[in-house]
Amino acid sequence: MKFYIMAAVLLFVANVAQAQTTNLYTEEEYPQAYCMALNIYYEARGSNLADRVAVADVVQNRVRDTRYPNTICEVVKQGRQHPSGAMIRNQCQFSWYCDGKNDRPQNEDLWIDAQMLAYQMVHEDKYRGITEGATHYHATYVKPHWASTLQLVGRIGAHIFYRWK
């Protein structure tokens, strides 16, 4: 009987430990890098480095473009809101932000990778310009209505990139 109780306790502890991912830095310490890391994680986790960099480069390009908000967090969180201020589901610039799912990264290795890359891009200005000014992208398996109104930049990994004409 003691064995079963101990096994149950160990399984519980292991599951709790798996559910908690490591943060290299907190949202309070580096808010812009943290927002960028979340966007890299949810938009391109598991993709090659060039694809992850390109997704982040689009966010930075939007920050520099007067048609978009002025900070990384504002760009990442941009979307339609209810009069109450709550985000309208599936009406955000980046789909993961208002899809109704938990936004806590679950894969520790991919989350650490996203945090490292975001920090390098935001605070060390690495990898800038890979998308040649692209402000839009989509996964290769979708055909958004807006794609024909923009100039095609090219494909990097699992995404197709565009900029204003």
What do these predicted ranges mean?
Residues Q20-K165:
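Bacterial extracytoplasmic/cell-wall-associated proteins, especially those involved in peptidoglycan
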Residues M1-A8:
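Sec-dependent signal peptide recognition
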